C-alpha cells in the first residue's frame, strides 16, 4: 500500500509518500511545494494541484491522507487554507484515490501516544517508523510523513485508536459523495 500524506498550506505544502509492506514502512519520496505569498491564491492553488498531480502520476498511491482544517485567528488565512484543501480534495477524487482526513491532534496521538506532542516529537517518530537517521526539514514535510504514517497505522489497527471506529473517510463521505454525484462541477 502506498499513501501520499499532505500537510496543506497556501505558502508551503508538505508531502510525503510512504510504502507499507506488511509491518514495514519505507520512505518513497517527500518534499515541500514552496510558493510565494506575492502570487495570487489562484496561481498558488494551480501549482499545488499540478505538482501533487505529478507526484500521484509518478508514485501511484492508492490513498491520499490529508490534514483537516483548523480554526485560525486570521479569517483570510483560514479561507485560503480551505481553498487549497478543496483543490486537493478535487484532485484526489479526479485521480480516483481514497481520501482520508486526520486532525493534527489525532496524527500526534497515533504517532507519539500524546495528542499535544510537539513538532519535534512527531518528526522524531516519523523518522523512527521510516528508519531515517538524519533530520528531515522543514516540519511541513515531517508533518506530511506523519499524516501518511497515521493513515497506514490506523488502517493496520482497523481504524482510529482514539475513536474506535473504522477508517476515517473524507468528512464522513461529504466531499467524496458530492464529487462523485456532481462530476460536471469539477474542473
Curated annotation (Swiss-Prot):
Entry cofactors: Mg(2+)
The UniProt record lists the keyword Magnesium: yes
Ranges in coiled-coil conformation: none
Keywords: Cytoplasm, DNA damage, DNA recombination, DNA repair, DNA-binding, Endonuclease, Hydrolase, Magnesium, Metal-binding, Nuclease
Gene Ontology biological process terms from the UniProt entry: DNA recombination; DNA repair
Cofactor: binding details: Binds 2 Mg(2+) ion per subunit.
CDD domains documented for this protein: RuvC (cd16962)
EC number: 3.1.21.10
Active-site residues (renumbered): 7, 67, 140
Compartment(s): Cytoplasm
Residues where Mg(2+) 1 binds: 7, 140
Keyword Transmembrane on entry: no
Pfam families: RuvC (PF02075)
Any one GO cellular component localisation term in the record: Holliday junction resolvase complex
Oligomeric form and interacting partners: Homodimer which binds Holliday junction (HJ) DNA. The HJ becomes 2-fold symmetrical on binding to RuvC with unstacked arms; it has a different conformation from HJ DNA in complex with RuvA. In the full resolvosome a probable DNA-RuvA(4)-RuvB(12)-RuvC(2) complex forms which resolves the HJ.
Family in the record: Belongs to the RuvC family.
Name of the protein this chain belongs to: Crossover junction endodeoxyribonuclease RuvC
Native source organism of the sequence: Prosthecochloris aestuarii (strain DSM 271 / SK 413)
Designated gene of the protein: ruvC
Amino acid at each position: 500500500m502506498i499513501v501520499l500524506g499532505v500537510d496543506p498550506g497556501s505558502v508551503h505544502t508538505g508531502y510525503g509518500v510512504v510504502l507499507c509492506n506488511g509491518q514495514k514502512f519505507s520512505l518513497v519520496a517527500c518534499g515541500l511545494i514552496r510558493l510565494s505569498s506575492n502570487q495570487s491564491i489562484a496561481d498558488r492553488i494551480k501549482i499545488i494541484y499540478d505538482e501533487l498531480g505529478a507526484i500521484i502520476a509518478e508514485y501511484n498511491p492508492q490513498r491520499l491522507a490529508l490534514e483537516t482544517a483548523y480554526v485560525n485567528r486570521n479569517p483570510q488565512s483560514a479561507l485560503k487554507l480551505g481553498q487549497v484543501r478543496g483543490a486537493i480534495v478535487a484532485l484526489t477524487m479526479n485521480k480516483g484515490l481514497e481520501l482520508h482526513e486526520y486532525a493534527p491532534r489525532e496524527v500526534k496521538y497515533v504517532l507519539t501516544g500524546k495528542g499535544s506532542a510537539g513538532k519535534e516529537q512527531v518528526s522524531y517518530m516519523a523518522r523512527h517508523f521510516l528508519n531515517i537517521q538524519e533530520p528531515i526539514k522543514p516540519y511541513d514535510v515531517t508533518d506530511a510523513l506523519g499524516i501518511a504514517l497515521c493513515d497506514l497505522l490506523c488502517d493496520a489497527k482497523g481504524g482510529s485508536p482514539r475513536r474506535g471506529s473504522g477508517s476515517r473517510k473524507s468528512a464522513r463521505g461529504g466531499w467524496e459523495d458530492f464529487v462523485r454525484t456532481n462530476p460536471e462541477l469539477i474542473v
